Amino acid sequence: MYKLLILIDGISNSGGTDRVASTLSSLLSNHNYDVTLYSLNSGEPYYPVDNKVSIRQPKSSMRLFKLFEFIRYAKNTRPDGVMIISMGKLSVQALLLSKLFRVKSRLICCDHVSIETFSAAVRKLKVFCYGLAEKVVVLTQHDKNYLTSAFSLKNVYVVGNISPFHHENSLNRFDDVFARKQNRVLAVGRLTYQKNFGRLLDIWKNVHKQGWKLLIVGDGEEKAELLEKIKKYHLEESAEIVSPSKKISEYYRSSGVIAMTSRYEGLPMVLIEAKNYALPAIAFDCKTGPAEIIKDDGYVVDYQSNELFTAQLNQLIASEQLRKNFAQAAWQNSADYGPELILKKWNDILN
């Protein structure tokens, strides 16, 4: 049996990367992989993890010492492969230390954010570290094309994220799912600079709402600022922010549109998950992800144009038939992120 050690920053957070790590480790553990999920930060898993997966956490409190503990664990247990799932910083640290301390396992780097979001100096450092890995797995074809053309990397592969809600399609009929939709625009994510929800509120104040409401699900350092903006724009009756919930599926199930105004992404789980609930999508064309996820099931909007985003959101609100057409396409396209296809790609990479 293939022994796989997966390193992540934390398993107790509600972010998309944490969701991916939990879902992927559970999937692999049920398909002839002996999986250990090593979380640098302590805490109980926020998302479900299969009981076949062994969960390890360091005892140290300082990050550097936590990384040293991980390296020692990797050297002692000698897994066939070490997979680093990272938002950027962790992959650099873990790859450098793994080579410095001569970890013998195959090193597989999985970065969940576009390298183009970093400065030129950081890009060079990351590309150097990518060269230390046997394989580099990115989330989009755009990222692979950039790394192979700009830096001539040969060890780059593309594997998308698995939707944790893929079972919804087999359990329900599309017409029943669509019938449960309410007049709500849903946005999900951390209330941070990256997710750019302030811009969504700037847009929402100009939308012809026709009884629709905006629901933002998330927590973070910008919450007070966003609440103040809701008050400033007099949106108290049409916009609301609620804390993250493990029952996020209920929000997906009952909403009519999913919206995203992020400054940058990797391959946003929110847009992938929304497909399983037949949600039409509207998102800015940020790097990277929306343009590869949204096909014939929504709008990808020029990043510079709030006006176009507003106009196309108005179209979605005004036309139930348009929403139904997009919803049907999203329902069908969700198969692209099902476990069978993603598992095959990982089998090819790991074996």
UniProtKB/Swiss-Prot annotation:
GO terms for biological process: carbohydrate derivative metabolic process; polysaccharide biosynthetic process. GO terms for molecular function: glycosyltransferase activity. Its EC number is 2.4.-.-. Keywords: Exopolysaccharide synthesis, Glycosyltransferase, Transferase, Virulence. Coiled coil: none annotated. InterPro entries: Glyco_trans_1. It comes from the Bacteria. PANTHER family: GLYCOSYLTRANSFERASE (PTHR12526:SF630). This is Amylovoran biosynthesis glycosyltransferase AmsD. It comes from Erwinia amylovora.
